[in-house]
Design a protein with these regions (language model features):
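STAS-typified acidic loop motif
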Residues: 33, 44-85
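Short, glycine-/small-residue-enriched flexible loop/hinge segments at domain edges that mediate gating
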Residues: 94-110, 124-131
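Glycine-rich beta-to-alpha active-site loop
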Residues: 119-162
Length: 423
């Protein structure tokens, strides 16, 4: 909901006027410019009031306290009552020191009220994903203002929404004052509020830092994960896993549920987004390798050809991706094939085929609920190229021999380094 909205109470005459065929009856005979202006203002007020009365209400943001009580999470539209809920949460948890903001906008009054609370309590603000429109009024009041590497701030002029989808420009003085009081550069504020209300301006991080809107850009391992701030239920966790790893849509549903449960538990225990993503990839890859280890020779040879196609897609310039593919990282193979300029048949069909050839496996500790996220040892590029060459040679051998060699190259356990500590 990337909008600024503001309330205005119109007269009963204005409401009646707007309700009468969109006010056309009131305009009949309106001769002078002053009269037309007055009638237009009355219609605008009536339309916005009717929108507030009869348009479907947007759901307000979810407000929650993170693990340990240090982080407040606000995710969703800044509608009536959001600031009051944050105020109550802060009163009960004075140890909170940071607020995560994920919002496409909402009511100007709520953004201003939330910003006042942030300033009063000396909170740092953090945007992991998107904070637009009214949300920025809260963000800029942070003592320190952190933007995630994937985060974006969006700005535009405020407006009022009419009942029939119209947008009406309004005075931007409150927004201008809020940005000024937060120390935002005047030229930046002017540019932000000059953006049409039906458009959005998302400056790059360098411009935001130069203007004083952001104090630091942070990596996803800096703060607790915020990807489930709007909904941390089981279905939401499952959907987020599939959004990040679509290859798991073809996986064993029970394994997907275990992976999602691990992810959800980590979110609730304060695991960082970076560690969460590493852990998701490791668990997905472990499960998929279990499936392929039990697949027939034809499926294994097809996996080998998919890995070769993936290595060609990433090229020699991407050493990390090449290393992952050469080591049999099924997730990396799938990602490379999905982004190939000329896609070849992707892995989903092979995974479905492998599942049909498998009894439901009992997975070991590597893929179990207690497994910890880990990073594989980096291989030098020369070794990566050598392994790809070995894979190519293996696939030129007779069918049974080729499958055996591909299994050895892609489906053995990779060397591991120290585990990442998981909360």
């Amino acid at each position: 909901m990337p909008i600024h909205t503001r309330r205005r109470i119109p007269s009963r005459f204005a409401i009646a006027c707007a309700a009468s065929a969109l006010g056309l009856g009131c305009l009949v005979g309106a001769g002078s410019a002053d009269t037309r202006t007055s009638l237009r203002m009355a219609f605008v007020g009536a339309s916005t009031d009717l929108a507030q009365r009869f348009a479907p209400a947007d759901a307000a943001a979810r407000v929650a306290l993170g693990p340990g009580g240090a982080d407040v999470r606000v995710a969703g539209d800044l509608m009536d009552g959001v600031a009051l809920r944050v105020e109550a949460l802060l009163a009960a948890n004075p140890q909170a020191r940071r607020i995560h903001l994920t919002s496409g906008g909402g009511l100007v009054e709520e953004g201003l009220a939330l910003g006042a609370l942030i300033a009063e309590h000396g909170l740092d603000t953090y945007v992991p994903d998107e904070c637009a429109s009214a949300c920025t009024l809260a963000f800029v009041r942070g003592r320190a203002r952190y933007l995630g590497t994937a985060g974006r701030l969006g700005f535009h002029a405020p407006y009022e929404a009419g009942l029939f989808g119209q947008t009406f420009a309004v005075d931007a003085s409150p927004e201008r004052a809020a940005y000024r009081d937060a120390g935002i550069a005047a030229d930046f504020t002017a540019e932000a509020l000059a953006v049409a209300s039906d458009d959005i301006w998302m400056p790059d991080a360098e411009r935001l830092i130069r203007a004083g809107a952001v104090t630091e850009v942070v990596e996803p391992d800096r703060f607790p994960d915020s990807t489930l701030d709007d909904d941390d239920g089981p279905e939401a966790a499952r959907a987020q896993v599939l959004r990040n790893l679509p290859i798991l849509a073809q996986a064993d549903p029970a394994a997907l549920d275990r992976i999602a449960a691990w992810y959800r538990d980590g979110y609730r225990n304060g695991r960082s987004e970076a560690d969460a993503f590493d852990g998701l990839r490791a668990r997905a890859n472990d499960h998929l390798k279990v499936l392929f280890r039990r697949a027939d020779d034809a499926t294994i040879r097809a996996l080998g050809h998919a890995a070769l196609a993936a290595s060609r897609a990433v090229g020699a310039g991407d050493g990390d991706a090449c290393e992952a593919i050469a080591g049999g990282d099924v997730v990396a193979i799938d990602e490379a094939l999905r982004h190939a300029a000329h896609p070849v048949p992707s892995l989903p069909a092979l995974i479905v085929q492998a599942r049909r050839q498998n009894a439901v496996p009992t997975e070991g500790a590597a893929a179990g609920d207690d497994a910890r996220p880990r990073r594989h040892a980096r291989r030098p590029p020369a070794r990566c190229a050598a392994r790809i060459a070995a894979l190519r040679q293996a696939l030129d051998r007779p069918a049974r021999e080729a499958a055996a060699e591909v299994r050895g190259l892609l489906l053995t356990e990779a060397p591991q380094v120290a585990a990442i500590a998981a909360p």
